[in-house]
Structure formats: structure tokens, C-alpha cells
């Protein structure tokens, strides 16, 4: 096995970093440690920690010995600006290159990319290469710091509680990290956080290097034999897969990495919350404790984030949904939401908005079944790869499944008769109800549900049409996200090591996607080797008003399903049959999830065109109630959502209640307005008042909605 470490990277975990100042525990967001009563499995710790460290050091020493026999030939390292640095094969590390550039860069670079592959800063280079260095202000740097912080968290948890660690990744939402562990009967709470944070501070102060080795499957099983969860993970790995193990201080953990240079780069650490979880999300498996955390390279950023969290709590979509009477969930149908009349208005308006765009962009809407015989899912591959996430049942001794996605049904539509090249591109849109069997512990408001709808569409086109269709989808996404007030970024994920189809088709598809993005004029982030095995994809990450990131839209080329369903069309040479390319795309993604994102993005203040409470008429007294009802009817007949407050409350109280309910327009009417056929208009968040005729007001309403529905 080839060595992946330098001699200096095998320092003992108590050795301080020579290039970075030590971190005091006061730099962490902690309070004095409280003596939380908890059992600690000392026997487990005394058995596993020394054993793992001993095995790690033995394997590491063997790899170090192997390194000595390898040729340390000169290599050229090319930086993004074109500059070339000299180095030695199997000796020079990205950290060495960073130090050549500047001391400041060496003190702040968290991770590198070698020929577009993420690489530890202290891992030797293996030949001539392109090298990029990333700090915390990049996605790659941030995610690496948080991934490494999960290991620091795991170390603190294991040392404090003697728990069996399970998995500890960055969160999928891109805000921090967590670690799952098995604690027996112990349930963690906020009271345990001070001691956990103290353990993390201790690890950071020691500047423990993150050290990497490669192991065989047998070595991994021996190393983690006392942890049944790790053993299960290892046994599930492919036989030919390279297994990597990382160490920081006393923690030796199964991990593919990469990681930051050492623990002292984490200068601010905070536990956020604890919850229960099931092993592998299966309610029939072991109950685990999950601790969420956040970390930063300085205290200022942590303080800013904690302030943001307090602000975000006020606008949690679950709270706003209840307050505005939009939706609710019920224990008799977990993961499937009830949308109340006001919430249904927003839900339908979102779909109408997309349908209006479909009309102008050449999409054809279809309706497909909700359940299919399992034979369909076997053809599509879902039976082998996705069945655990499906709801299945038997009808007349045959197995059926509720659809988790629309693509196989759309393949049947394409397949059901002979197709010609003249019909392409064929853009099929579907708002069909989808069901996915999410674990109960994973359900989270509208953002993680079991029953949902998507603005799902699939484009069947020729190879020559791919570039134009992709550009059209990007323009569609851009228009919608600008309406919502989102910013976004594009990431192109290219061919993985294992892929379906021929190399020429992949190369052309990737080139078409790159050209489409370049023509679109949006910056591109390249994720080499991160595409699906059935085709390259473009990931679209949006940022909302609070600068949180979400992945909603999808754009995926698929070479597999057309083959699985044997889809063909008659080419211009009618004697010849050709295979279409299939493009999966969604703009909103899950309508439920987009509903939640928009509710929080707007902080409950819906724009007029999508608002469930567009206007309310408030009569000053009983004398003007009849006129108020007349105004309400005129506005309603014009197709707008309008209410009337006919209570006997004073007008100031009516207006105040309407403001709190987030009505876009508050229309006050009294005897004067009744006599002139006008209304006194108050617009939300605008102190100025005006008087308008009903006709002028309706024209204003129409102008605010015409573009969208």
C-alpha cells in the first residue's frame, strides 16, 4: 500500500502546531462546566481507544517505511493563476506550497484540490498537478472545517460519555454538522453541552493533526470490532473500495475525508441542539442521540451566526404557518400536510405561476397514475436501488408501489406509440402527487415530507438539441428565482469513475452543458466526477433573504432510462431508429418545500401576486358596512382575495389587526368614501395613504398579478 502521509504528519496528538497560535478554551462559546449526571462506559473506552491508536500507528509506520523506497522525483505544481511551483513527488504537500506563497495563506488554507480532487493539506503530492487552495470563505473550505469539527465533536462525545460513535457529517443544509452516537439509556440535552464544548476546546487547544491512512477491509474490521455500527458500515462497502481512516488526538474514525490540517483551525465551537435519531433512519433499529454543532475560524463569525439563528427562529415556517392559518400536520398522517384554505391559495398560485410559464415555454402538461405494478420499477431500476424509500402494497397478489417520482411514467408516455424526430423536443410536465417513505425521525415541517408535489418535467430530445434545451431550462430557472428574489449558483457535476454509456456521448454532453452555461452568462463551479452514473447534472443552489442555501431546482441528463425502456424515435432517415436523450428538470422542486422556503424568505409578508390575504375592507362604522360589502364583492368578482371586517370594533383596532395579519392592502371606507365611490388605501409597510376609485384600484391589482398568473 502506498504511503499518503509525510514523516512530520505523524506527530503525537499532544504536539502543538508550529505555525498557528494555541487556542484557549475561553475562545469557545461555553459556560462553566456543569456536572451533568451520566453513566460513562470506562471499560469500552479503555478497550477501544488504545487498541485503535496502536493499530493506526502500526499501519502508519508501515506506510512511512514504504514511502522511503518511492522515487522523490521533481514535480511541477500549477496554480490557478498559471504560476508553477517546484516540488518533490511523495514529499511536497499542499501546505508546503501554501507556505511558499505566504505565511498568511499557510495559516488560513483549510483544504486543497489536486487536479480537481479534494486533498488534505498535509497529504503528499503524487506527481505533476494543478493545485487550488481553499479558505473558509469558499464552500469547499467551509464544508471541510465543519466536517472536521464533526470529528472534534465526536472526540468530545466519546471521551465524555464512552458512547459508540455512528456517523458525523456536515448537514445537508450547509449549516454546521452533527454526530450520531449510541449512548444506551442516556438522553442528551442542553445541560450536557458545556462539558461537550469543554472537550472540543481541549482538542482545539492541542492542535491535533488530522492524520490519514488507507486500510484493508480486514484491518478496518479489526480496528472497529467493538463498534457494531462501524462494523455494519464497513461490511456494506464494496470489496475493492479503498478505505480511509483518520485520527485526531485520541479519536480514530472511519472517514473518507479530507480534513483541515489540525484542530487549532477551529477557533469557535458551539453545540446547537440535541435530538434522537434512528440508526440508518430505520425506526425498527437502535435509537441514537444526535448532537448538532456549528464552528468558525473566529469568534466574530460565530457571534453573527448565533444572532442570525435567533432572528430565524421568529420566521420558522412552522410557526408562521400556524399563525397565518396556512397548514397543519396530524399524527394520523405523519409527513403529509393539510393545507387550509389560505395555504391552498398560496399552493395553487405557485403551481399556476409555473403553469403560466409552461404555456409560454412550450411544455405540455400530462396526468399520470399514482401507483404502478412493481414491474415498472424493476424496469426503471427503482426496485433495486430505491425500494426502501417507496410505499409498496399488494393488490390481487401482485406488488404495487406509490410513485416516488414521475420519470418512469413519462417514459411510458413516450413509448406508447411510434415517435418521430419531428415531435422532438417533447417537454412533458406533471404535478402528480409523489410519496417517499421518509423515516419518521427525518420528517421536518414542509421541508421533509412523505407526500408532496413537484413541478416535475422531462424533456425528450435529440443529442443535437441538448444544449438549447439546457439553456432554455436555465433561463426558466433564472426568471423564476428573480421573481422570488433569490440569488443562486450553478455547479456542473461531470462523469464519475463508474458510468453508463460510451465516453464520446459523455464528453459531448458535458461540453454541451458547459457551453450552455457559458452562453447563459452565469459563473460555473465544476465538480469533477460528481455526476450520477447515468448522466452529468447541473446543481442549482439558491440563497434566500437570510443567506441560507437550498437546493431546489434540478437539471439532470439521463442516458440510462431511455435504454432501460428502449425508447426510440424515427430519425430523418426513416429507416433508422435513434435513442432520445432524457432531461430531468424541476424549478420549484417540491412545492411543499418551496412553500416553506418562501414563507421564511418573505418572513410571512407575501408579495401581492401570491398573497392569500391580498386585501381587506374595513368600514369605519355600521353606517358604511353596506358599502364595504359592495366593495368586497367588486374586488372578489375581479378575481382577488378580499375580506371585510364587519365587526363592531373601532377602526384603529381593525387596521391594527389587518396589519398583523399581513394583508397587502387595507381599504378603509366611511360615509365620505361611500358617497364618492372610492376607498382610502393603506399599503402594507407604507405609511402613506391615498384615496382611489375602485376601478383604479383594480387596475393596480391586475398590473401586480398579470406577469405571474
UniProtKB/Swiss-Prot annotation:
It is found in: Mitochondrion; Cytoplasm, Cytosol. Residues 73-135 form the TGS domain. GO terms for molecular function: ATP binding; metal ion binding; threonine-tRNA ligase activity. One of its GO terms (biological process) is threonyl-tRNA aminoacylation. GO terms for cellular component: chloroplast; cytosol; mitochondrion; plant-type cell wall; plastid. It catalyses: tRNA(Thr) + L-threonine + ATP = L-threonyl-tRNA(Thr) + AMP + diphosphate + H(+). It is an enzyme of class 6 (ligase). Its main location: mitochondrion. InterPro entries: aa-tRNA-synt_IIb, aa-tRNA-synth_II, aa-tRNA-synth_II/BPL/LPL, Anticodon-bd, Anticodon-bd_dom_sf, Beta-grasp_dom_sf, TGS, TGS-like. Gene3D superfamilies: 3.10.20.30, Anticodon-binding domain (3.40.50.800), Bira Bifunctional Protein, Domain 2 (3.30.930.10), Threonyl-trna Synthetase, Chain A, domain 2 (3.30.980.10). Disulfide bonds: none annotated. Its EC number is 6.1.1.3. Residues 1-21 form a transit peptide. Transmembrane segments: none annotated. Keywords: Aminoacyl-tRNA synthetase, ATP-binding, Cytoplasm, Ligase, Metal-binding, Mitochondrion, Nucleotide-binding, Protein biosynthesis, Transit peptide, Zinc. Zn(2+) binds at residues 407, 458, 584. Belongs to the class-II aminoacyl-tRNA synthetase family. HAMAP family: Thr_tRNA_synth. NCBIfam families: thrS (TIGR00418). This is Threonine--tRNA ligase, mitochondrial 1. The gene is THRRS.
Amino acid at each position: 500500500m502506498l504511503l499518503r502521509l509525510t514523516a512530520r504528519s505523524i506527530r503525537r496528538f499532544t504536539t502543538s502546531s508550529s505555525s498557528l497560535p494555541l487556542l484557549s478554551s475561553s475562545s469557545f462559546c461555553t459556560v462553566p462546566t456543569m456536572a451533568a449526571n451520566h453513566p460513562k462506559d470506562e471499560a469500552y473506552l479503555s478497550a477501544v481507544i488504545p487498541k485503535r491508536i496502536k493499530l493506526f500507528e502500526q499501519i502508519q509506520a508501515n506506510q512511512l517505511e514504504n514511502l522511503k523506497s518511492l522515487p522523490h522525483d521533481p514535480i511541477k505544481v500549477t496554480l490557478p493563476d498559471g504560476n508553477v511551483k517546484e516540488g518533490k513527488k511523495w514529499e511536497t504537500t499542499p501546505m508546503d506550497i501554501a507556505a511558499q506563497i505566504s505565511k498568511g495563506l499557510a495559516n488560513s488554507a483549510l483544504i486543497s484540490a489536486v487536479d480537481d480532487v479534494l486533498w488534505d493539506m498535509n497529504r503528499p503530492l503524487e506527481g505533476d498537478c494543478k493545485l487550488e487552495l481553499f479558505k473558509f470563505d469558499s464552500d469547499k473550505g467551509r464544508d471541510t472545517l465543519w466536517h472536521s469539527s464533526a470529528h472534534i465533536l465526536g472526540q468530545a462525545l466519546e471521551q465524555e460519555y464512552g458512547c459508540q460513535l455512528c456517523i458525523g457529517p456536515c448537514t445537508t443544509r450547509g449549516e454546521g454538522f452533527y454526530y450520531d452516537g449510541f449512548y444506551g439509556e442516556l438522553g442528551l440535552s442542553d445541560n450536557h453541552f458545556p462539558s461537550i464544548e469543554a472537550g472540543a476546546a481541549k482538542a482545539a487547544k492541542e492542535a491535533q493533526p488530522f492524520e490519514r491512512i488507507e486500510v484493508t477491509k480486514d484491518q478496518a474490521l479489526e480496528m472497529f470490532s467493538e463498534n457494531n455500527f462501524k462494523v455494519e458500515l464497513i461490511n456494506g462497502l464494496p470489496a475493492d473500495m479503498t478505505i480511509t481512516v483518520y485520527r485526531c488526538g485520541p479519536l480514530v474514525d472511519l472517514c473518507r475525508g479530507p480534513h483541515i490540517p489540525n484542530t487549532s483551525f477551529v477557533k469557535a465551537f458551539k453545540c446547537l441542539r440535541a435530538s434522537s435519531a434512528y440508526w440508518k433512519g430505520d425506526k425498527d433499529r437502535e435509537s441514537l442521540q444526535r448532537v448538532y454543532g456549528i464552528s468558525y475560524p473566529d469568534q466574530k463569525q460565530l457571534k453573527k451566526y448565533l444572532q442570525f439563528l435567533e432572528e430565524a427562529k421568529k420566521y420558522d415556517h412552522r410557526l408562521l404557518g400556524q399563525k397565518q392559518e396556512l397548514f397543519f400536520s396530524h399524527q394520523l398522517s405523519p409527513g403529509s400536510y393539510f393545507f387550509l384554505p389560505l395555504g391552498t391559495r398560496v399552493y395553487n398560485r405557485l403551481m399556476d405561476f409555473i403553469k403560466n410559464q409552461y404555456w409560454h415555454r412550450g411544455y405540455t402538461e400530462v396526468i399520470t397514475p399514482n401507483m404502478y405494478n412493481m414491474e415498472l420499477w424493476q424496469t426503471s431500476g427503482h426496485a433495486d436501488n430505491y425500494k426502501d424509500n417507496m410505499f409498496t402494497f399488494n393488490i390481487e397478489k401482485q406488488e404495487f408501489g406509490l410513485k416516488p417520482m414521475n420519470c418512469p411514467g413519462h417514459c411510458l408516455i413516450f413509448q406508447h406509440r411510434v415517435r418521430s424526430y419531428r415531435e422532438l423536443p417533447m417537454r412533458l410536465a406533471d404535478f402528480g402527487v409523489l410519496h417517499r417513505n421518509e423515516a419518521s425521525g427525518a420528517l421536518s415541517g414542509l421541508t421533509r415530507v412523505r407526500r408532496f408535489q413537484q413541478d416535475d418535467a422531462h424533456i425528450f430530445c435529440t443529442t443535437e438539441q441538448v444544449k438549447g434545451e439546457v439553456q432554455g431550462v436555465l433561463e426558466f430557472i433564472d426568471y423564476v428565482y428573480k421573481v422570488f428574489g433569490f440569488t443562486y449558483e450553478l455547479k456542473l457535476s461531470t462523469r464519475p469513475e463508474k458510468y453508463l454509456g460510451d465516453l464520446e456521448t459523455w464528453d459531448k454532453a458535458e461540453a454541451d452543458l458547459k457551453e450552455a452555461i457559458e452562453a447563459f452568462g452565469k459563473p460555473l463551479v465544476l465538480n469533477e466526477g460528481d455526476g450520477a452514473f447515468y448522466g452529468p447534472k447541473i446543481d442549482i443552489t439558491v440563497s434566500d433573504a437570510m443567506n441560507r442555501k437550498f437546493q431546489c431546482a434540478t437539471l439532470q441528463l439521463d442516458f440510462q432510462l431511455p435504454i432501460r425502456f428502449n425508447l426510440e424515435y424515427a430519425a430523418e432517415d426513416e429507416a433508422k431508429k435513434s435513442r432520445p436523450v432524457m432531461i430531468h428538470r424541476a424549478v420549484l422542486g417540491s412545492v411543499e418545500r418551496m412553500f416553506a422556503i418562501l414563507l421564511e424568505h418573505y418572513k410571512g409578508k407575501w408579495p401581492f401576486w401570491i398573497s392569500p390575504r391580498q386585501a381587506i375592507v374595513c368600514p369605519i362604522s355600521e353606517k358604511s358596512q353596506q358599502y364595504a360589502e359592495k366593495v368586497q364583492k367588486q374586488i372578489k368578482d375581479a378575481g382577488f382575495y378580499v375580506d371585510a371586517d364587519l365587526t363592531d370594533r373601532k377602526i384603529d383596532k381593525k387596521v391594527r389587526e389587518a396589519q398583523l395579519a399581513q394583508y397587502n392592502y387595507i381599504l378603509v371606507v366611511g360615509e365620505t368614501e361611500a358617497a364618492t365611490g372610492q376607498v382610502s388605501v393603506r399599503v402594507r409597510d407604507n405609511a402613506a395613504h391615498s384615496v382611489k376609485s375602485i376601478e383604479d384600484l383594480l387596475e393596480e391589482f391586475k398590473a401586480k398579478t398579470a406577469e405571474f398568473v
